[in-house]
Amino acid sequence: MNKPAVIALVITLLDAMGIGLIMPVLPSLLREYLPEADVANHYGILLALYAVMQVCFAPLLGRWSDKLGRRPVLLLSLAGAAFDYTLLALSNVLWMLYLGRIISGITGATGAVAASVVADSTAVSERTAWFGRLGAAFGAGLIAGPAIGGLAGDISPHLPFVIAAILNACTFLMVFFIFKPAVQTEEKPADEKQESAGISFITLLKPLALLLFVFFTAQLIGQIPATVWVLFTESRFAWDSAAVGFSLAGLGAMHALFQAVVAGALAKRLSEKTIIFAGFIADATAFLLMSAITSGWMVYPVLILLAGGGIALPALQGIISAGASAANQGKLQGVLVSLTNLTGVAGPLLFAFIFSQTQQSADGTVWLIGTALYGLLLAICLLIRKPAPVAATC
């Protein structure tokens, strides 16, 4: 058993549960300090504030994990999250919410370091499967977290934050007492041994520029369903909240299944390039169908295609991780987290605006834009060459 990688999965699951726990109740907590008319604005600002802090600080924390080790940075990140949730649980004024979110965003390196641990402890050929499991663990946490948070929030809007703080404290103790990072056995030339840990961001990222563009754009496209799903299904099919929730739960469960099981199984038989193409084509087809379907029942078969598209990102992340030495995985994974959070800020703003402008005349426009962007990514993947020093092609 790959103990470091398994612990990384557990850390990711618990971290995602903590995030998911607070999602249903943060607006309720804001209502304790704000009039109803101001809740939505402050809710959006709090979410964006965390993401912006991640964009700025995730690469730096990833770099520190290369220099100081994965364990100290993981402990810092988990301590920051536990402090954030404790502060929110005890909050009695609005500024405490903002302070907690800022601290959590600055110290939030769990995702980057967990991915670095997976890269440290697995062979290049195994990374697609393990990155798929990592994504599935995060998805499972985001399914379980809101369910628990919703129930706890009925008792008190502060209770989910208490539970999230306890989860992070338990994870902190697990990392402190159990986690031992994998011993890096990667063979390096003598000059690389001296210089690799000090390699600049530009030197590291330049050979991976096109792959990083593909990663960023794929994550940006993923913000389309995350942003407009509720609005679109209510507008076109007149769905109520129960129907929307059922569809999202089904999509989340199937997405986790494809990432945890299907991506790894395919990686044993197919190249990463083939898996990426298959995932992008599945998503592009699903987006095209979403723009055209006219009845609510038609959504459910499309969910399978949307979930199937989830096999692309683990394969893409596996290829990108192969473009960095073991001494630079934290730096690289921090950049990927930063890019992901950047799409989390820009995507909802962009796609919500597009949907609002086209809802009355052509509410499927946003899905067609996603289809076109996938076409661009497929063309770019044909042009990408092998990045130095050890990355494969896309």
Swiss-Prot record:
SUPFAM superfamilies: MFS general substrate transporter (SSF103473). GO terms for biological process: proton transmembrane transport; response to antibiotic. Its main location: membrane. The keyword Cell inner membrane applies. It is a multi-pass membrane protein. One of its GO terms (molecular function) is antiporter activity. The chain crosses the membrane at residues 6-26, 42-62, 73-93, 94-114, 135-155, 159-179, 198-218, 243-263, 274-294, 296-316, 335-355, 364-384. It is found in: Cell inner membrane. Keywords: Antibiotic resistance, Antiport, Cell inner membrane, Cell membrane, Hydrogen ion transport, Ion transport, Membrane, Plasmid, Transmembrane, Transmembrane helix, Transport. One of its GO terms (cellular component) is plasma membrane. Belongs to the major facilitator superfamily. TCR/Tet family. Resistance to tetracycline by an active tetracycline efflux. This is an energy-dependent process that decreases the accumulation of the antibiotic in whole cells. This protein functions as a metal-tetracycline/H(+) antiporter. This is Tetracycline resistance protein, class D. It comes from Salmonella ordonez.
